[in-house]
Design a protein with these regions (language model features):
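Terminal-region recognition feature
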Residues: 1-123
């Protein structure tokens, strides 16, 4: 296989500035995705657990083949909208393996406004 030759100078000021900038953006993205993955408020999540119910992301995890990946899409839908009360627009959606077949999974997050839809949920 032919090797691709780069002309990027990893020691240049511009490279270092770009690297630092994009590293901050990467960390910001990770933080936002982790925040959204919490679902609704702590109170809502606790009420869910007190009723003996699984949290929505746990339900999704249990449907998937053990150890298989889940490619979530739309995790940042409605981010910064609705006063921050709509993580992932109240919906967990993605592609995963069930019985070794790729499937699309859609799960209403009942910890977010009881699982009701926001306008951004259907966009």
């Amino acid at each position: 296989m032919q090797q691709l030759i780069t002309q990027v100078d990893a020691n240049s000021e511009q490279y270092q500035a770009n690297f630092t900038h994009h590293d901050k953006l990467r960390q910001q993205l990770r933080d936002r995705v982790a925040e959204v993955a919490q679902g609704g408020s702590e109170r809502s999540r606790q009420r869910h657990l007190d009723r003996g119910r699984l949290l929505p992301r746990e339900r999704v995890r249990r449907v998937l083949d053990p150890g298989s990946p889940f490619l979530e899409i739309g995790a940042l839908a409605a981010f910064g909208m609705y006063d921050g009360d709509a993580p992932a627009a109240g919906l967990i959606a993605g592609i995963g393996l069930v019985e070794q077949r790729y499937v699309m999974i859609v799960c209403n997050d009942s910890t977010v406004k009881g699982g009701t839809y926001y306008p951004a949920t259907v966009k």
